[in-house]
């Protein structure tokens, strides 16, 4: 198992694709490690989910593969704990004993895949590829949201007020009525907001709103 120091060092690599394997069965854990390491994934293996939860890993393209039934914690409980911490990393569940109810619960909470033991090498790889792709999309969206937040900080107090009204779909006359500004000043603030936020249309501005809602 990697140490925290090694884990953080590896996570900082922009090209590394990480797989966190939580499996109490030594043989299964080893098999998954071997398969994925041969494909150049950075694999972090844990026998106990509490060991996994104890690490402080950085944001990176990653996917979690976890057994559904373990002595100290179920896969559902691990998933819930990650969500509570704001860690929305894609999760692949593996199990040979889980009920249909557990599988449905996992998928309802956002699980990526549910593999029933014994699963094929191909199914495992497909699930990991899918998970990494999904996490890369999440990180890209997060980066865009952070950029939008930085752009918002460049707005003056008055410009920010106009920005919030534009988000609500206010037209020029409605902005004038809501703020008491003259029509000329309202249009001027609107132009500055569009320029600073790097958009050319109200539709683009509304897309920025969606990014902010997902932050």
State what each model feature region is.
Residues 67, 95:
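Active-site residues of response regulator receiver
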Residues 99, 115, 119-128, 174:
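C-terminal output helix
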Residues 13-27, 32-36, 49, 64-65, ...:
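Conserved acidic segment of CheY-like receiver
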Residues 45-63:
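Acidic, metal-coordinating helix/loop segments flanking the phosphotransfer/catalytic sites
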């Amino acid at each position: 198992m990697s140490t925290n120091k090694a884990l953080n060092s590896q996570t900082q690599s922009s090209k590394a694709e990480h797989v966190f394997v939580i499996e109490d069965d030594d043989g299964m854990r080893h098999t998954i490690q071997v398969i994925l390491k041969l494909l150049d994934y950075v694999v972090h293996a844990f026998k106990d989910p509490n060991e996994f939860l104890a690490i402080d890993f950085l944001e990176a393209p990653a996917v979690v593969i976890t057994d559904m039934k373990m002595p100290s914690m179920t896969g559902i409980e691990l998933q819930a704990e990650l969500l509570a911490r704001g860690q929305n990393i894609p999760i692949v569940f593996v199990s040979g004993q889980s009920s249909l109810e557990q599988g449905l619960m996992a998928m309802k909470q956002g699980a990526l895949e549910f593999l029933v033991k014994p699963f094929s090498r191909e199914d495992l790889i497909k699930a990991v590829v899918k998970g990494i792709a999904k996490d890369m999309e999440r990180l890209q969206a997060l980066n865009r949201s952070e950029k939008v937040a930085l752009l918002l900080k460049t707005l003056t107090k008055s410009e920010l007020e106009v920005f919030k009204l534009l988000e609500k779909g206010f037209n020029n006359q409605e902005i004038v009525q809501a703020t008491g500004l003259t029509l000329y000043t309202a249009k001027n603030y609107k132009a500055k907001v569009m320029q600073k936020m790097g958009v050319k249309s109200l539709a683009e501005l509304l897309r920025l709103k969606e990014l902010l809602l997902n932050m």
